[in-house]
């Protein structure tokens, strides 16, 4: 067997069969992913969920979310375009998901930009059992309390080491943290996974962060280890971005290619090209 441990380092690369097996499970089980998400990217999130191999539902009326989430394999809460009614729906659905053991993925879009947004993210974290907190570096830095810069919904980065910021956030919130960036960082506060798949074109298209949360939810719906599943999801999404960017002429040809590449991604493709390093 080849040695996949870097010389002089405790880091090792995760066997590609692991993310490949999770992608195969998503495709075979086709879990329902319930989204309470933002109005800007809702259609893209629904379609990327289908491309990953899962099934989306976008119900957010407080009167029906408890019933809808009961049929789901995972729940996504995305605070991109907040309202009081939507927050109520998130709390109702989140509590019901917790009762049923359904994993909840929280995307704290733009946390730190306004008091309402920040208070909502903290309320969801304090009230619900969040399985995965998926955000960019600025958002995770804000929630970690270590310093993060957010302008609108865009990240300005973190003040310190990204890995330690993500680790601190995971420890303080009790969640798996999935922090996207040039290199994605996934940690449960102890283990750290660095995901090297992706392309800068993904940063130039609105909604890729939200879509990453949808793909993450599809993977955690079929997994017991949410950190590994989150890393596998980002590797799959990032690989689709790499391959989609290769022939794209601009943001909208890239957008189409991103969907097409994820839909066409096979477990063997992911096994051979996922770049996930464990520390």
Swiss-Prot record:
GO terms for biological process: thiamine biosynthetic process; thiamine diphosphate biosynthetic process. Its EC number is 2.7.1.50. This is Hydroxyethylthiazole kinase. Transmembrane segments: none annotated. GO terms for molecular function: ATP binding; hydroxyethylthiazole kinase activity; magnesium ion binding. The gene is thiM. Keywords: ATP-binding, Kinase, Magnesium, Metal-binding, Nucleotide-binding, Thiamine biosynthesis, Transferase. It catalyses: 5-(2-hydroxyethyl)-4-methylthiazole + ATP = 4-methyl-5-(2-phosphooxyethyl)-thiazole + ADP + H(+). It is an enzyme of class 2 (transferase). It comes from the Archaea. CDD domains: THZ_kinase (cd01170). Catalyzes the phosphorylation of the hydroxyl group of 4-methyl-5-beta-hydroxyethylthiazole (THZ). Pathway: Cofactor biosynthesis; thiamine diphosphate biosynthesis; 4-methyl-5-(2-phosphoethyl)-thiazole from 5-(2-hydroxyethyl)-4-methylthiazole: step 1/1. Gene3D superfamilies: 3.40.1190.20. Its cofactor is Mg(2+). Pfam families: HK (PF02110). ATP binds at residues 134, 180. Substrate binds at residues 58, 207. InterPro entries: Hyethyz_kinase, Ribokinase-like. Belongs to the Thz kinase family.
């Amino acid at each position: 067997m080849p040695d996949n441990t870097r010389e002089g380092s405790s880091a090792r690369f995760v066997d590609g069969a692991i993310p490949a097996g999770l992608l195969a499970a998503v495709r075979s089980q086709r879990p329902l992913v319930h989204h309470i998400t933002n109005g800007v990217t809702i259609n893209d999130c629904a379609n990327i969920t289908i491309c990953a191999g899962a099934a989306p539902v976008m119900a957010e009326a407080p009167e029906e979310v408890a019933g809808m989430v009961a049929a789901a394999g995972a729940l996504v809460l995305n605070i991109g375009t907040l309202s009081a009614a939507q927050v109520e729906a998130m709390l109702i659905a989140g509590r019901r998901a917790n009762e049923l053991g359904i994993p909840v993925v929280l995307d704290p879009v733009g946390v730190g930009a306004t008091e309402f947004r920040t208070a909502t993210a903290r309320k969801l974290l304090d009230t619900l059992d969040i399985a995965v907190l998926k955000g960019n570096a600025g958002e995770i830095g804000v929630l970690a309390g270590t310093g993060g810069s957010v302008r609108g919904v865009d990240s300005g980065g973190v003040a310190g080491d990204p890995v330690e910021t993500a680790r601190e956030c995971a420890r303080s919130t009790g969640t798996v943290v999935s922090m996207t960036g040039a290199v994605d960082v996934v940690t449960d506060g102890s283990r750290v996974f660095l995901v090297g798949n992706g392309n800068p074109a993904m940063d130039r298209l609105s909604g890729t962060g939200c879509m990453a949360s949808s793909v993450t939810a599809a993977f955690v719906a079929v997994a017991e280890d949410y950190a590994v599943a989150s890393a596998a999801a980002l590797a799959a999404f990032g690989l689709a971005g790499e391959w989609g960017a290769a022939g794209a002429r601009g943001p909208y040809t890239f957008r189409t290619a991103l969907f097409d590449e994820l839909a066409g991604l096979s477990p063997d493709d992911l096994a051979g090209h996922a770049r996930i390093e464990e520390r």
